[in-house]
Regions:
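An N-terminal RHG(E/S)-centered segment typical of histidine phosphatases
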Residues: 71
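Asp-based, Mg2+/Mn2+-dependent phosphohydrolase catalytic module
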Residues: 2-5, 9-41, 46-68, 81-106, ...
């Protein structure tokens, strides 16, 4: 461990010095603008509905309670979703007793906002979450013509005859055989794997994306997926299936239905590059008046295949904690630059690295 920390320290200390303009802003606003921190949420700051004990102290350190005596910009980068950025910020703020703004939150589907100009008025199927919650988020992002699997079941219950929608179900009724889909977007975990697998595969292989039309031997509309995590951690003693499990099922069903054809899709969420570019834009916007880009970004996560793989590929410094799905010495396939017990230790290491560099 000592050699690993020394390597990280050496690499950080060799980075270029802070530009003078950034130093002036730093001293004027008491911000340490040369670095930024990105936290995963589940398994790092919280575990299900329980907070991780060191989380609040870690955020306090970044708020200026550190040997730098300066604030360090930070953001939350999660593969979770199904709520708005504001709702997630409010939820985590309540849990930790620490104010976090919506501008600091990147959800798995946040970068999908960039698709809104392309599909502004087009009919899209949004999958995931309860009722029309994800459809509401899509509307907020700028998608104006959105339907959900439950809307389709309300139109033709026999399309998935294993459920009965109650009177409380929020649905928008329309004649789906007259309104073809231009795209399918999976925003969040499926709340009914069977229903969603059936409906998504129906749309993907129907001529022109029109439900009820003949099946064709190819994919007819684009598919966008938001969270590749196969598992996630909550209050249960062992990890649970995540949205990535739905993706695996969808690919398997598609292969079986099309005699081995490959499913084509665009992925969002960690560990994919689009998510990290979006997070960097969020971090830059937090200190936009200073007009400074962060030279070092530290990513703290618990999932080697998502948090660590993505951070390493983005050129960030990755720190793996043992409070979520990982509990070993380091991951063999996606090794982190540093491995620590919890988020408090992670932020302490970051402050130590930045303090040593800052005082040179």
């Amino acid at each position: 461990m000592a050699s690993t920390i020394a390597t990280a320290l050496t690499r950080a200390l060799r980075r270029p010095q802070t530009p003078l303009s950034c130093k002036r802003q730093l001293h004027a606003q008491k911000w340490h603008l040369d670095a930024a921190v990105v936290f995963d949420i589940d398994g790092v700051l919280v575990r299900g509905k329980q907070t991780i004990r060191e989380a609040r102290r870690a955020l306090d350190m970044l708020s200026g309670q550190n040997k730098l005596n300066r604030r360090v910009p930070f953001a939350l980068l999660t593969n979770g979703g199904g709520v708005s950025e504001q709702a997630k910020a409010s939820q985590i703020s309540r849990m930790l007793g620490f104010e976090i703004s919506a501008d600091q939150v990147v959800l798995a589907h946040s970068p999908m906002q960039a698709l809104a100009p392309k599909y502004h008025d087009s009919h899209v199927l949004v999958v995931g979450g309860p009722d029309r919650q994800c459809a509401d988020i899509a509307h907020m992002y700028g998608f104006r013509n959105v339907s959900t699997p439950n809307d389709i079941v309300a139109w033709r219950p026999e399309i998935w005859p294993f459920i009965t929608l109650g009177p409380e179900a929020r649905v928008e009724r329309r004649q789906f055989d007259k309104h073809p889909f231009a795209a399918v977007m999976v925003f969040h975990d499926s709340f009914d794997f069977g229903r969603d697998l059936q409906i998504v595969t129906d749309v993907l292989r129907s001529r022109d994306g029109r439900l009820g039309a003949e099946y064709v031997g190819r994919q007819t509309v684009p598919l966008y997926l938001s969270n590749a995590d196969l598992i996630f951690s909550n209050e249960y003693v062992r990890p649970r299936f995540g949205q990535g499990a739905f993706h695996e099922c969808l690919r398997a069903m598609w292969s079986a239905l099309t005699r081995g054809a490959s499913l084509e899709y665009t992925r969002y969420g960690k560990p994919f590059a689009v998510q990290y570019r979006h997070a960097e834009q969020v971090l830059d916007a937090l200190v936009a008046p200073a007009n400074c880009r962060h030279r070092r970004i530290y990513a703290i996560g618990d999932n080697p295949a998502a948090d660590i793989a993505g951070a390493n590929a983005a050129g960030w410094t990755s720190i793996l904690v043992r409070t979520g799905v990982f509990s070993g010495a380091n991951d063999s396939e996606n090794p982190a630059h540093l491995v620590v017990d919890h988020v408090g230790d992670a932020v302490e290491k970051i402050i130590d690295i930045e303090h040593q560099r800052f005082t040179l």
